[in-house]
Amino acid sequence: MSKQKGKRGEREVKDLHNEFFIDQGLDIRLERNQMQSAVGGYDLVGLDFLAIEVKHCEVFQLTKWWAQTMNQMKDGQTPVLFYRRNRVPWRVMMIGCVINSDKQPAMIIDIAVDDYFRWLATKLRSLKSED
């Protein structure tokens, strides 16, 4: 049951991303990492700058999940952890900056899914303008 719940969670988060990309008019699609059990890696692939891990589990182990997310990312990637329990909205943990007068220290942040997608839209626009 737990593996099925995990796969279902991965599909939900993949679909959230793909709906977002369609709404933004972007030709990007995320897929589940089918090789993760054999060779490791994060759960969703398709954007090289993100390492997305998904946890849909009743036994809450946020510290362990975050460590796994950090360990599976590659240099230059942003670690992103989507997590939730049954009947609770998805939450997102990632590295972000909190504006604090003249300094913007990077730290672990926990945000709502809508805020994550606002960040992702801004990030994709900035990457496009660099091309």
Predicted regions: what is each one?
Residues 1-131:
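Catalytic phosphate/metal-binding cores of nucleic-acid and nucleotide-processing enzymes, i.e., regions
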